[in-house]
A protein has these predicted regions:
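Glycine-rich phosphate-binding loops of nucleotide-dependent enzymes
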Residues: 1-362
Length: 362
C-alpha cells in the first residue's frame, strides 16, 4: 500500500527500505519493472536491501556502507556479488551454503490441525499439519503476516491453541509446562524475532543472559556465575562476538553480535528441537553465514530445526524441505532441491486454490 501511495503521488525521489520483504517473487518482479519505468522517466530511486541478487538486478550504481560509513560507490555493471560482499565485510568471504545430508531418520514433532486465534477472535493459524524430522532444516516461507510468527510461538508454548495437537513420541505437549516438556525428552530452543524484547534482557550483560538458560543447574541456592562467564568467553571466541566485555549490556552491541549471543546461548543447551524466527534479519553477510554454519552444525547432531525466513534464495540452499504459509494455512510442503523460487511464489499467493478448498470444507 505504501509503495502504491508513492507511485500515485508521482514522486520524483523514491526511497524504498527492504521493499520486497512482504512480496512474492512475482510481485517483486512487477515492482522492479515499475521502478525501471520510473527511472526511465527521470525519477531517482534509492533501494535499501540486504539481498545482493536484487541489488545486481535492479540498480545502476551501488553504495556500500560498513559500520555506518560509506566505503565505496560502484557501477553495478562493473561488480558482482563477491566483490560487493568483500566491500561490505572488509574481507573475502565464501558465498556458499552447505546442505549436509542427514544421517538421521524419523519424526521429532508431529503437528496436527493446529489452529490459533488472536485477541479479536481472528484465526492466525488454520488447520496447520506437518512434521519436523530429526536432522532436518524445515524452512517456513510466506509473505509477512501469513502466520509464521504465530506458528513458532505456538510450538514454543507462548500462544494458546484453539484446536489441534503437537505430538512428541505420540504424546501431546500442548498445555504442558517447560519442566514437564523437558521430562518427556524434549530440549527445545527458541530464537525469536524480537531479540532484545523477547530473547535477551537488554540491560544485562552476556554472562547474565546466558544464566537465564542455566540458573536452575546450580548445586546451591545461589546463582553461580563462574560457568556462565566461562561459557561467555567460549562463545566470544567460537562465534567471533564483538563486545567490550561479558558484563557489557547487550543493548550496546550491534545487531549481529546480539544475534550471536542469543544463538550461542540456545545451541549450547544442546536442543533436539530448534525454532528460529528470521535468524539473520538485519545482519551483515559475514554474520549471516556464521548463523547458517551453526544451524548446519546442529543439523549434523540430529537437531530438528524450524527455520522461518524471508530470503527464498537462502532457503533453497539451506533447507531440506520448505513449507509455505498463506493466511495461516499450509499451501504446500516441497523438497528444496526440486522446487524453484517461482513455484514457491505461487504457493505464497495460494495460486493453486488450497485455501479456497479448505474454506469450503470449513
Amino acid at each position: 500500500v505504501e509503495i502504491l501511495k508513492m507511485l500515485y503521488r508521482e514522486a520524483k525521489i523514491l526511497i524504498l527500505d527492504e521493499p520486497t520483504a512482504v512480496l512474492t517473487p512475482q510481485e517483486s518482479r512487477n515492482l522492479f519493472n515499475i521502478l525501471r519505468k520510473m527511472r526511465d522517466n527521470g525519477c531517482t530511486v534509492i533501494i535499501i536491501t540486504h539481498k545482493l541478487n536484487e541489488v545486481l538486478e535492479i540498480s545502476d550504481n551501488v553504495a556500500i556502507l560498513r559500520k555506518g560509513k560509506s566505503v565505496a560507490t560502484v557501477k553495478t555493471s562493473e561488480t558482482d556479488a563477491l566483490k560487493l560482499t568483500e566491500l561490505m565485510v572488509g574481507k573475502k568471504v565464501t558465498l556458499s551454503i552447505d546442505r549436509p545430508v542427514s544421517e538421521y531418520t524419523g519424526n521429532l514433532l508431529e503437528i496436527h490441525h493446529l489452529t490459533t486465534e488472536n485477541d479479536d477472535g481472528v484465526k492466525t493459524l488454520r488447520d496447520v499439519t506437518f512434521s519436523l524430522n530429526k536432522g532436518e532444516i524445515l524452512g517456513v516461507a510466506g509473505v509477512a503476516g501469513s502466520g509464521q510468527k504465530e506458528l513458532c510461538e505456538t510450538i514454543a508454548g507462548l500462544m494458546k491453541v484453539k484446536k489441534g495437537a503437537i505430538l512428541y513420541k505420540k504424546e501431546n505437549i500442548i498445555g504442558k509446562s517447560p519442566e514437564e516438556i523437558i521430562k518427556i525428552g524434549i530440549s527445545m530452543s527458541f530464537i525469536p524475532e524480537d531479540r532484545l524484547g523477547m530473547g535477551l534482557v537488554a540491560s544485562m550483560g552476556m554472562a547474565d543472559n546466558l544464566l537465564l538458560k542455566r540458573y536452575k543447574e546450580g548445586k546451591t541456592p545461589f546463582v553461580e556465575k563462574k560457568e556462565a562467564r566461562r561459557l561467555s568467553k567460549k562463545l566470544i571466541e567460537k562465534l567471533n562476538i564483538k563486545t567490550p566485555g561479558i558484563d557489557t549490556p547487550v543493548r550496546q552491541l550491534s545487531g549481529g553480535n546480539v544475534q550471536k549471543v542469543l544463538l550461542g546461548r540456545e545451541i549450547e543447551s544442546a536442543p533436539n528441537v530448534l525454532i528460529t524466527a528470521y535468524a539473520v534479519r538485519g545482519l551483515d553477510i559475514n554474520s549471516s553465514y556464521t548463523v547458517y554454519d551453526n544451524l548446519n552444525e546442529q543439523k549434523k547432531k540430529g537437531t530438528g530445526i524450524l527455520y522461518i525466513g524471508e530470503d527464498l534464495d537462502v532457503m533453497l540452499e539451506l533447507c531440506d524441505r520448505i513449507m509455505v504459509l498463506c493466511h495461516g494455512r499450509v499451501t504446500g510442503i516441497v523438497d528444496a532441491k526440486d522446487v524453484t523460487k517461482e513455484q514457491i511464489g505461487l504457493l505464497m499467493t495460494d495460486a493453486f486454490g488450497k485455501e479456497e478448498d479448505s474454506d469450503e470444507q470449513d
